[in-house]
Regions:
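Conserved beta-propeller blade signature
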Residues: 12-14, 66-70, 117-119, 185-188
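Loop/turn-rich, solvent-exposed surfaces of beta-rich toroidal or solenoidal domains
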Residues: 101-164, 172-173
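Beta-propeller and closely related beta-sheet repeat lectin domains
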Residues: 5, 55-58, 105-108, 173-176
């Protein structure tokens, strides 16, 4: 039996994305009551095995009601209308990748201002030649990891191609972005305990919310936000 999970999310369609910390893949559970507190049941799409064989599964609902499964870093598939499983084979998103492409995780998609926004988490390395997301043998390693960043790219189609990535949050990677009832933007984060930046803090590995701003087509932290 699966005794723990990570990177879990709850969606308004009463589906819970549950990734096993035991490395068994990503699963979708459905609320039997239609309420977020459950109880939850397994869906047909992962009765025999995980619906996705890797970590960091999430769901995205488009403006036309179509729901997509988004997995790990670069993967997507349309869900069946009844949310019982995948309606198509898992596809690879079309992206403007780094060269060479580093390890990426925490993929999440949302739509705003007529664009699809692909959110991912990548390690920034601080090296003798400057800061970089590109991992190079002899230059970057676990000791050069500095910050676990939130990067975002946009596209006109949910499958891509997604444009050039930009840094949205330094040190606050692995996110969901959402608007509250007042229209304020927020990003979730968990403060990865690894990396030189995290070593500067006494407490890490904790959930948090970051107030965000959307300006000139990009998201960034709202340093002037004041709670009511």
């Amino acid at each position: 039996p699966i005794k723990s999970s990570a990177a879990s999310d709850v969606y308004k369609r009463q589906a819970c994305m549950n990734q096993s910390a035991g490395g068994r893949g990503s699963f979708i559970l459905r609320s039997t009551t239609g309420k977020p507190e459950g109880p939850y049941e397994n869906i047909e799409g992962n009765e025999d095995k995980a619906i996705f064989p890797n970590i960091d599964g999430s769901l995205f609902e488009d403006t036309d009601g179509t729901v997509y499964f988004v997995g790990h870093n670069h993967y997507i598939a349309r869900m069946k209308p009844d949310m019982s499983g995948l309606a198509e084979e898992i596809k690879t998103l079309k992206e403007s990748k780094y060269s060479p492409e580093p390890y990426v995780e925490g993929a999440f998609i949302f739509k705003y201002d007529g664009k699809y926004h692909l959110v991912q988490a990548i390690w920034a390395h601080r090296t003798v030649k400057g800061d970089t997301y590109v991992e190079k043998e002899g230059l970057t390693n676990k000791k050069t990891r500095y910050s676990y960043d939130c990067i975002i790219a946009t596209a006109d189609n949910v499958y891509g191609p997604y444009g050039k990535r930009y840094n949205a949050i330094t040190g606050g990677g692995h996110n969901n972005l959402f608007q509250d009832k007042d229209g304020n933007w927020w990003a979730t984060m968990f403060f990865n305990p690894r990396g030189a930046q995290a070593a500067e803090y006494k407490v890490t590995c904790r959930p948090g919310l970051i107030p965000m701003l959307y300006e000139n087509g990009k998201f960034k932290p709202n340093h002037n936000y004041q709670a009511k």
